[in-house]
Structure formats: C-alpha cells, structure tokens
Regions:
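Conserved non-catalytic scaffold segment of RNase H-like nuclease domains
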Residues: 2-5, 10-99
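Short alpha-helix plus adjacent loop in nuclease-associated cores
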Residues: 126-141
Length: 141
C-alpha cells in the first residue's frame, strides 16, 4: 500500500538555515484518495535565522492572513519535528511525499528532518522522496 503524504510548508526565506520554516501542514491519503490523517504545526524561528526581506514583502502583500496564522501556537523546531515524525510513523509504510512545488517543500522538510530528527529516525520516513503535485496524472492517483 502506498501512502501519499501531501505536504505544504511556508518559510520566511528561500533556504533553510539562514531562514526558518514557519509552518508545515500535511494530509495523508491512500491510492483511492481516502484520508488517513492530517497534521499541522507552526514553528518558532530558528536561532540566528532572519526573515528574508523579499519573502516577507510577498507575505504582507499576497498572504497576510497566512503569515498571521503561522504565528499562532508556535513550537520549537525540535518539538514540532518530533511531533511530525511521530505522526508520520503512525502512517502505513511506503510513504511518498507529494507537494507543489515539490523541490522547495522537500528541501525544507528534509533539512528539518535531518537537523531535528536525525538522532531518532533510522531513515528518512519517505520511501520515495517526493513528486510534484502537477505530476499526479503520471502516478495515476
């Protein structure tokens, strides 16, 4: 059985480390489209990270409500990623991450997994790293 973990992240800059992931949402579905669970969390900024000016300008002009929502119930990246890891491990194996744009979201999620979960996960919790939401037809889901 394949579990598709459809993820969406918001970040305050173009790359992890100098900037922070501010929120992560995911919904897990099987091949038939049955929802298996969902997850969402908002993160406190990384220590010494700073929001990128052009990213913050985009948020304030295009998605101010998303930016405000991301400031609610924030947790540390370590705590948040441990919660995400716990949730992922409840899902049936052969987990495939899906997102759009997949390379951007996967870069952030993988960096946070490697940085905050490497000590407790034996492997990245996705069988296939990712596919882009625009490629769904190719996967026949």
């Amino acid at each position: 059985m394949t579990t598709y973990v459809v993820c969406d992240i918001e970040a305050d800059g173009p790359i992890p480390g100098p900037h922070s992931m501010i929120s992560l949402g995911a919904v897990a579905v099987n091949r038939e489209g049955k929802e298996l669970g969902d997850f969402e969390i908002n993160f406190l900024p990384l220590e010494n990270a700073k929001p990128h000016p052009s990213t913050m300008k985009w948020f304030t002009t295009h998605a101010p409500e998303a930016l405000e929502l991301s400031k609610q119930n924030q947790v540390s990246p370590k705590e948040g990623m441990n919660k995400f890891g716990n949730w992922l491990l409840t899902l049936p194996k052969h987990r495939v991450m899906a997102a759009h744009p997949a390379p951007f979201d996967f870069m952030w999620i993988n960096w946070y997994i490697q940085t905050f979960l490497a000590d407790r996960l034996e492997e990245v919790p996705f069988t296939m790293p990712f596919f882009d939401g625009r490629d769904q037809a190719a996967f026949d889901i």
